[in-house]
C-alpha cells in the first residue's frame, strides 16, 4: 500500500467540485459484484454526460501521469473508474473487489485498487477507508487531492459517514508486473536509481548498470 499526496492541485479540485454538482447520481449498488452489492450503500455519478466524461478524463490522466503511480503500480490497463458520493448514513461494508473487470478485449485482472479523495477530510465525519492487511487494519482518510493505492486482494470497507459528504474517485489497475513482490523490488530499484542520479553524473557506469538491471528485471517479469 502507498499514499501519494497532491495528485491534484487546488484549482483542479475546485473545478471538479463544481462539476460534481452538475452530474446525475444513481444507486452505487448497480456496479457492485454479487457479494459487495449486499453491503454497498452510496451514490455513484453517471459519467456518460459531457461533463462526466470530462471530469473522468481529468482525474484519470492525473493518476496516469504521476511518476510514483507509474513506478509503484507499473500500470498495463486501467478499468473504467467511478466517482462515488457517501452521504450521512452511507457506508460500504467489508468486501473484496471483483478479480476480473470489463468485457471482451477490455477485460482485465485487478491487481491494484486506488481511491483518490476529492473532499477535504474536515468536510465529513466518518467515511474512513479501512483495509484489512495480514498484520493490521489500515485506516485511510486523506486530504483532497491525495490518493491511496492498495492490493485488490485485500478485504476493505468504508465506515459509515455520520455527517457531510465524501466524494472519491475510485479505480483499478492491471499491472504489467503481476507479482506484488516483484513490483516491490522494482519500486526499490527505481527509488535507488533516482537517489543515485543525484550523486553520479549521467552516463556513469553506476547509473548505466542500474538502468540495465531495472530494464532486464522488467523484461523478465513483465506479463504482457
From Swiss-Prot:
Pfam families: 2OG-FeII_Oxy_3 (PF13640). PROSITE patterns: FE2OG_OXY. InterPro entries: Oxoglu/Fe-dep_dioxygenase_dom (IPR005123), PKHD_hydroxylase (IPR023550), Pro_4_hyd_alph (IPR006620), Pro_4_hyd_alph_FE2OG_OXY (IPR044862). Residues 77-175 form the Fe2OG dioxygenase domain. Binds 1 Fe(2+) ion per subunit. Keywords: Dioxygenase, Iron, Metal-binding, Oxidoreductase, Vitamin C. 2-oxoglutarate binds at residue 166. Disulfide bonds: none annotated. It is an enzyme of class 1 (oxidoreductase). GO terms for molecular function: 2-oxoglutarate-dependent dioxygenase activity; iron ion binding; L-ascorbic acid binding. Fe cation binds at residues 95, 97, 156. It comes from the Bacteria. GO terms for biological process: DNA damage response; intracellular iron ion homeostasis. Its EC number is 1.14.11.-. Its cofactor is Fe(2+); L-ascorbate. This is PKHD-type hydroxylase HNE_1625. It comes from Hyphomonas neptunium (strain ATCC 15444).
Amino acid at each position: 500500500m502507498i499514499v501519494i499526496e497532491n495528485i491534484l492541485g487546488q484549482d483542479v479540485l475546485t473545478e471538479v467540485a463544481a462539476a460534481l454538482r452538475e452530474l446525475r447520481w444513481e444507486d452505487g449498488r448497480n456496479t457492485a459484484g454479487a457479494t459487495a452489492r449486499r453491503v454497498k450503500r452510496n451514490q455513484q455519478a453517471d459519467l456518460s454526460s459531457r461533463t462526466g466524461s470530462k471530469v473522468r478524463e481529468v482525474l484519470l490522466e492525473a493518476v496516469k501521469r504521476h511518476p510514483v503511480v507509474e513506478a509503484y503500480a507499473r500500470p498495463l490497463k486501467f478499468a473504467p473508474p467511478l466517482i462515488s458520493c457517501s452521504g450521512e448514513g452511507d457506508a460500504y461494508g467489508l468486501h473484496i473487489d471483483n478479480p476480473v473487470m470489463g468485457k471482451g478485449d477490455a477485460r482485465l485482472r485487478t491487481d491494484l485498487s486506488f481511491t483518490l479523495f476529492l473532499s477535504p477530510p474536515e468536510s465529513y465525519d466518518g467515511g474512513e477507508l479501512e483495509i484489512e492487511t495480514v498484520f493490521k487494519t489500515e485506516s485511510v482518510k486523506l486530504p483532497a487531492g491525495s490518493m491511496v493505492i492498495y492490493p485488490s486482494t485485500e478485504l476493505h470497507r468504508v465506515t459509515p459517514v455520520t455527517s457531510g459528504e465524501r466524494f472519491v474517485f475510485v479505480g483499478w489497475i492491471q499491472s504489467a508486473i503481476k507479482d506484488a513482490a516483484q513490483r516491490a523490488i522494482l519500486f526499490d530499484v527505481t527509488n535507488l536509481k533516482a537517489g543515485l542520479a543525484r550523486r553520479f553524473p549521467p552516463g556513469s557506469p553506476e547509473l548505466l548498470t542500474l538502468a540495465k538491471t531495472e530494464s532486464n528485471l522488467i523484461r523478465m517479469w513483465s506479463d504482457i
